[in-house]
């Protein structure tokens, strides 16, 4: 084997590595092709990631924790320490852009729902931000009606891994979801892609918000495609690690 062939082979390997590396960090994955307008960036909890996400997505998701003592919505996931980034500052950083925002409010419940609604209304009014571009998500759906009436989109963050439950336990969970949706028919439901088939079967007409952040590129390919094609699925969150 000549030196030129060896160098040629090394060049191909290096190029392949760079292509795979670039694909890993690209939001334009093959399994999402044809539906890029339907995907959003998951956990955009910093201004740097926000700036880069806005160049690649029409929708973003972020985590919020409300502090009633200071009347502040803090942008962070409870598994990570707060960086001091407030939602007011976050929205100001959008400039004139108005992406669809999926707000996972970690501690929204009946004790603080009215305060959170007032805070959100204040922030969005100042920016003249359209409420129909905002999804309010919580594990405690009892007060979501307040946000629905105010003009926001809303979603009940379901218990995870329904597909792992025994039939009796699954039945109990499904009945609870049905009760919520009967009393609040405009509320959507949100969960990870693993439970999509269950939601499709039992809640075929309900608006769904799904995240695909741990899917297999091969074994889950068909499932992800079916999720994206489903007209009742409003948005799919995907992993995004900007360079």
Regions found by a protein language model. Name each.
Residues 4-243:
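Phosphate-group recognition and catalysis centered on beta-loop-alpha active-site segments
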